[in-house]
Design a protein with these regions (language model features):
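Anion-binding catalytic surfaces of enzymes that hydrolyze or transfer phosphate/sulfate esters
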Residues: 151, 162-165, 173-174
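Extracytoplasmic/periplasmic substrate-recognition and gating elements
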Residues: 171-175, 179, 185-239
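Periplasmic-binding protein-like
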Residues: 87-98, 228-240
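Extracytoplasmic ligand-binding site segments that recognize negatively charged/polar headgroups
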Residues: 1-159
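Hydrophobic packing residues within well-ordered alpha-helices of enzyme cores
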Residues: 14, 106, 183-184, 238
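Hydrophobic residues within well-ordered alpha-helices
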Residues: 14, 161-167, 212
Length: 240
């Protein structure tokens, strides 16, 4: 393995176990020319310093997806989502944790209800965090009776939920792929009236990166490839 698509706890674990080559980003012309190296999105990966051991490849943002012909009243906050779920009982759910998207949805509810700032400096012990997020947990418990299968079980993955949405079994889908809706409309999977949306306060987003394995036999080639992936042409082509 030469190049690795990585972010979050996987990057932190690999870096702390000395499995990554670097720092290398300062050797990439396209990184130096087109990337804001001082941006927090580049300097930090899930609050962990990147230190030049990974180069940004793309960004993801949690969005919700609904068919406006079926549900024209799209929720713009957690409180409106509760009313939405109650209006469409049995037709809303989210992927079972620890699914990546399901976890992001729950974290988004936590930030929406409990606020985000307190977690930036909070002591990371179980009891402190548990107490801080209790209002959001109570909110989720209040949703359960109105969810698909009364919240007793949840879809095993975001892929399963996507298929349930496309089949009309549920009326809401959530994804990290902000461009998935347009692609699925073009492919005929979603109706033309399907729309992605976010809460008014926004949703969780993150950056994904490319790293190089420390035991790579072709580190120079990996750097050439990553540099090319940072070019304006390749980045623009990702959104065609």
């Amino acid at each position: 393995i030469d190049m690795i698509w990585i972010n979050g706890e996987n990057f932190q674990s690999a870096k702390e176990k000395d499995m990554l080559y670097g720092p290398f980003t300062d050797k990439l012309p396209n990184f130096n020319d087109y990337v804001d190296a001082d941006s927090e999105d580049v300097k930090l990966d899930f609050a962990y310093p990147t230190d030049g051991y990974e180069a940004p490849y793309g960004k993801a943002q949690v969005v919700m997806v609904a068919d406006t012909a079926v549900t024209p009243d799209l929720p713009t906050s957690a409180e409106e989502l509760k009313a939405f779920v109650q209006k469409y009982p049995g037709k809303v759910t989210y992927p079972a944790l620890p699914d990546f998207t399901g976890s992001a949805f729950v974290r988004n509810i936590i930030y929406e209800i409990c606020g985000y700032e307190q977690f930036l400096t909070m002591e990371a012990d179980k009891e402190t965090v548990k107490e801080a997020i209790e209002p959001a947990m109570e909110y989720l418990r209040e949703l359960n009776p109105y969810l698909w299968n009364q919240g007793k079980t949840f879809p095993d993955s975001s892929t399963t939920l996507d298929n349930m949405f496309a089949d009309g079994e549920v009326v809401l889908y959530m994804t990290y792929g902000a461009y998935d809706t347009a692609v699925n409309i073009a492919d005929g999977k979603y109706t033309e009236t399907t729309q992605s949306f976010q809460f008014d306060k926004g949703t969780i987003g993150n950056t994904n990166f490319m790293a190089i394995a420390k035991n790579s036999a072709n580190k120079a080639g990996a750097m050439v490839a990553i540099n090319e992936m940072l070019s304006p042409e390749v980045q623009a082509d990702r959104y065609d």
